[in-house]
Amino acid sequence: MRVSVFAVGRMKSGPKRELVERYFDRFAKAGPPLGLEFAGVSEIPESRGQTAQLRKAEEAQRIHEALDNAKSGGTSSGGAALILLDERGKALGSEAFAAIVGRMRDDGKRQLIVAIGGPDGHDPALRSRADLVLALGELTWPHQIARILIAEQLYRAATILAGHPYHRS
């Protein structure tokens, strides 16, 4: 299963970018034996729309296109799964998150898209299409830190699925 991260906004060079790249690199190396291929990060420009509703709709359009492209791949399971990161989502532990990623893979999903929304959040139509709306705890995180956290959690999920001692339960 190809795993892609869609993030609204750009991450500038510096220590945060180096850290996120380190975790995505670890995930890219740990994932293939488990049937998980890291397909990269797609940075979506922040919308300049006049209203929050318009901005969310414009930002969601890129994610809808990626989902539609994956669905046209022709798998009977629908092709793609979508996880949205949102402070109002469901909080999970690392083992539960790993189990969900593993189940999506085992169900034959060709692609997993993890989406980090813009400052206004996610479009309601995109939220209704999501397989999981995930909170990274009850706190609100800046987008750069949310990207670091999901990179680390994807790597951690791979190590949990592999039985690697990185995660100590």
From Swiss-Prot:
One GO cellular-component annotation of the UniProt record comes to:
cytoplasm
Q: What is its EC number?
A: 2.1.1.177
Q: Which GO terms describe its molecular function?
A: rRNA (pseudouridine-N3-)-methyltransferase activity
Annotated residues for binding of S-adenosyl-L-methionine? L85, G117, L136, G137, E138, L139, T140, W141
Keyword rRNA processing annotated: yes
Biological role stated in the UniProt entry = Specifically methylates the pseudouridine at position 1915 (m3Psi1915) in 23S rRNA.
**Could you identify this protein by its name?**
Ribosomal RNA large subunit methyltransferase H
On whether Methyltransferase is a keyword of this UniProt record, the answer is yes
Q: How does it assemble?
A: Homodimer.
NCBIfam families documented for this protein = PRK00103.2-3
| Pfam families listed in its UniProt record | SPOUT_MTase
The entry assigns this protein to a family as follows: Belongs to the RNA methyltransferase RlmH family.
Q: Which UniProt keywords apply?
A: Cytoplasm, Methyltransferase, rRNA processing, S-adenosyl-L-methionine, Transferase
| Annotated signal peptide | none
* Taxon lineage: Bacteria, Pseudomonadati, Pseudomonadota, Alphaproteobacteria, Hyphomicrobiales
Annotated compartments:
Cytoplasm
The superkingdom of the source organism is Bacteria
What is the species listed in this Swiss-Prot or TrEMBL entry?
Brucella ovis (strain ATCC 25840 / 63/290 / NCTC 10512)
Task: State the SUPFAM superfamilies in the record.
Answer: alpha/beta knot (SSF75217)
PANTHER family noted in UniProt: METHYLTRANSFERASE, RIBOSOMAL RNA LARGE SUBUNIT METHYLTRANSFERASE H
Q: Which reaction does it catalyse?
A: pseudouridine(1915) in 23S rRNA + S-adenosyl-L-methionine = N(3)-methylpseudouridine(1915) in 23S rRNA + S-adenosyl-L-homocysteine + H(+)
